[in-house]
Amino acid sequence: MDIKQKADSLARKYKTRNPFEILQGLNAILVFAPLIDTRAFYQYFQRNNIIYIDENLPRHEQAFECAHEMGHMFLHKKANTIFMDTRTELNTCRYEREADLFAMSLLVSDDMIAE
């Protein structure tokens, strides 16, 4: 299943494109907190999916960040991109592009674009 299909599948299953509602249905943990030098990040810890979002962002930006981090949750669960970004010279651009595509596909359907 490609990235767009995965996002569309989630939207159909949960009958919404609201990432906060989908995340709740997935029993993932969502944490709003003041973050420094980052807008949001995903963590897989002790078999829990946790998404942290900067509480100071406007709600529409929080929604995009939530969808973006969900992309990491579904596409890159085993990749420790925070570690790769801060402790190695590995390029994580591909992961970020894929998470952006997932977020855009989740938030905006083909029908919405056609209108």
Question: Where in the sequence are the language-model features?
Answer:
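Active-site hotspot residues in diverse enzymes, especially metal/ion-binding acidic/histidine motifs
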Residues: 1-115
